[in-house]
Amino acid sequence: MIKVGILDSTLREGEQTPGVIFTVDQRVEIAKALSDLGVSMIEAGHPAVSPDIYEGIKRIVKLKKEGIITSEIVGHSRAVKRDIEIAAELEVNRIAIFYGVSDLHLKAKHKATREEALRTIAETISYAKNHGVKVRFTAEDGSRTDFDFLVTVSKTARDAGADRVSIADTVGILYPSKTKELFSALTREVPNLEFDIHAHNDLGLAVANALAAIEGGATIIHATVNGLGERVGIVPLQQIAAAIKYHFGIEVVKLDKLQYVSSLVEKYSGIPMPPNYPITGDYAFLHKAGVHVAGVLNDPRTYEFMPPETFGRTRDYTIDKYTGKHALRDKYEKLGVKISDAEMDQILAKIKSNTTIRFYRDVDLLELAEEVTGRVLKPRPPEQIEALISVKCDSNVYTTSVTRRLSVINGVKEVMEISGDYDILVKVQAKDSNELNQIIESIRATKGVRSTLTSLVLKKM
């Protein structure tokens, strides 16, 4: 029977993404969101790196003690006693000690022999255990380490007191069949020890390798929200969670909360989500080709691996030159507009003849229908309202601090600092005018906001 959980490393590995820095408050909020999501472990950072990381972990551990956060809290540490002491004084649940074990790392980085490395690993793990915490050892560059030596390293870590060893594919060179073979062999050769995989995504194989590691016996997968991390990052949390559910039937996190957590980290990291990103991208459940849309309208399983509602999403489709009559009729029915078959054919012909328009929005379709029918058409109220809120800040405040406060208001989709008469531009979405007014009032009530100007979005090209 497969047993697997998620260690989320957004606050440690994720912050190693170039250009990404989380404030203390952001670290705490992300940790709470990850706990609510249901990850098994939160790697909260490397406390010896900087005072803000230390303070962030301190506050996260406090929330853990209060029962607000339920995930196991992990502190990162070099194989250095002072690092271990700093992590231990924070009273984290587990200290994760890392050390490069490949011959390349031993020679180029540590300037140590294999024997010296084994002594360092044993001594530091034992030292951490003496502080009364659980210990994980990370075999950095484990995927390029001689297998027999990797077995010796794992046994040394186990015998010194570690109950977990993480195999790091540090430069992302593993491939699935090799990964399964590696973990199968390790779990066979080193009993009474559990293994993690820390898979980097340099070749785009991190998710596939994580699934293969599960098949080989790994019980914890390291992931980050949106796949953040050094260079091109590691396993994206939303992708591996969906894949584990689909292939193994195991729900390692609350899937319907992935969208919120992804958006939260997108805002705080400043790394935009590509629209075609799996699971949480704008296009993940958006269909285009006429044959596809017709299939989805009859039975969504034709072109969806799982229902979007599983992930707190909804399906939609675009209208353009690829559109068929099924999609167009469904769109007009949703708008509450009655169109005859002959009129529908004329509208569709106009759409297909205009090859330069990327998306036909609802307002475009209404204009086309009125042009063809000669009638003034009254659609149902829109399902959502989009607006742009221009914000002017008080002269004595730091604009970025206001931007951060605005970015976490419900309904706010994007926040941009701009030049000109206003300081910030906020993109918002609301289901109706009442909700829009509530969002606007929340923006106006934000500390540092002097005035606002609201513009409704009528059409997108």
From Swiss-Prot:
Spell out the Pfam families in the cross-references. Answer: AsnC_trans_reg, HCS_D2, HMGL-like
- What residues bind Mg(2+), as annotated? 13, 198, 200
The EC number of this protein is 2.3.3.14
MF terms from GO for this chain are:
2-isopropylmalate synthase activity; homocitrate synthase activity; metal ion binding
Q: In which pathway does it act?
A: Amino-acid biosynthesis; L-lysine biosynthesis via AAA pathway; L-alpha-aminoadipate from 2-oxoglutarate: step 1/5
Q: Where does 2-oxoglutarate bind?
A: 12, 76, 136, 170
Q: Which catalytic residues are annotated? A: 292 (proton acceptor)
- What processes does the entry annotate via GO biological process terms? L-leucine biosynthetic process; lysine biosynthetic process via aminoadipic acid
Q: Which cofactor does it need?
A: Mg(2+); Mn(2+)
Which keywords belong to this entry?
Amino-acid biosynthesis, Lysine biosynthesis, Magnesium, Manganese, Metal-binding, Transferase
> Reaction catalysed?
acetyl-CoA + 2-oxoglutarate + H2O = (2R)-homocitrate + CoA + H(+)
- EC class name: transferase
Ranges for the Pyruvate carboxyltransferase domain? 4-259
Identify its protein family.
Answer: Belongs to the alpha-IPM synthase/homocitrate synthase family. Homocitrate synthase LYS20/LYS21 subfamily.
Q: Which PANTHER family match?
A: HOMOCITRATE SYNTHASE, HOMOCITRATE SYNTHASE-RELATED
The protein depicted here goes by the name Homocitrate synthase
